[in-house]
Amino acid sequence: MIRALYIGRFQPYHNGHHYVINQIAQEADELIIGIGSAQMSHEPADPFTAGERVLMITGALQDLHKPLYVIPLEDINRNVLWVSHVRAMTPPFHRIYSGNPLVIRLFHEAGIEVLSPAMYERATLSGTKIRDLIACDKPWEDFVPPAVVRVIQEIDGISRIRALNQDDGDCPGR
């Protein structure tokens, strides 16, 4: 049995994450989704709380048909200890999937198998781009699973993102 870990900030969870997780699910029997920087929220780059991100992810993956654990992981700002922190906060896992060079290095040095999944449509599917679209009142809904649209609407995330970004001046006509 293979239990795999995939860590991301998921600000918000989008179709790129969804594609990668579905690819991982073809190789693993159980999945652990680690919500990185769980302590961050209500910031332009991190508008959603860990709990809101849990709702997005569990809603989007309800049809995965695999055991799934969604675990918030707070930053500890001591990279040398971070892998131990992650291990303490998650069920035991056999491998990690990541495209983040620091995460790859830290887990590799800890002797854990690290696989780098191919990014999916990275040019259009990034949390930054989706947050910018929301902030600028442009269509964004097609870039995230329907469950994520529902959560963002339910928590009034659109107005939160716009308020957090109101002073950046990057949106024409705003």
UniProtKB/Swiss-Prot annotation:
InterPro entries: Cyt_trans-like, NMN_Atrans_arc, Rossmann-like_a/b/a_fold. Gene3D superfamilies: HUPs. Pfam families: CTP_transf_like (PF01467). It is found in: Cytoplasm. It catalyses: beta-nicotinamide D-ribonucleotide + ATP + H(+) = diphosphate + NAD(+). GO terms for molecular function: ATP binding; nicotinamide-nucleotide adenylyltransferase activity. This is Nicotinamide-nucleotide adenylyltransferase. It comes from Methanospirillum hungatei JF-1 (strain ATCC 27890 / DSM 864 / NBRC 100397 / JF-1). The lineage of its organism: Archaea, Methanobacteriati, Methanobacteriota, Stenosarchaea group, Methanomicrobia.
